[in-house]
């Protein structure tokens, strides 16, 4: 009887913690949506990546209020996506390039460290690309996407 009661209390505590997290996540998500809408007010802002125009991951819900004219849906080809972002930045746009998982951003590191990172130096200050990179890190709630989709590579980018 005591074990069943203890187990019931533990389950109730887990439920209450999950409910609190839902509330926090909702507030956090709302702030992301507000920031995306604020960025979209500027004519030079372009959103590109996977699931920016069609559902497919949690990031989609943060851009669904943005005008379709400001969004470019892309297939899975991360290196090209970063290259496109750099090209858009050269033309005066501010691309907001979305990688649904940090693991996917790793595939774009060549463009990031060999081109985006060096362009201001190579062009002697003529080009200063402004690119906003969005990704999610280590999400295991509500769905654990497994080891290849929940890694945190933050230290590698420092």
Model-derived regions: residue spans:
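Thiamine diphosphate
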Residues: 2-158
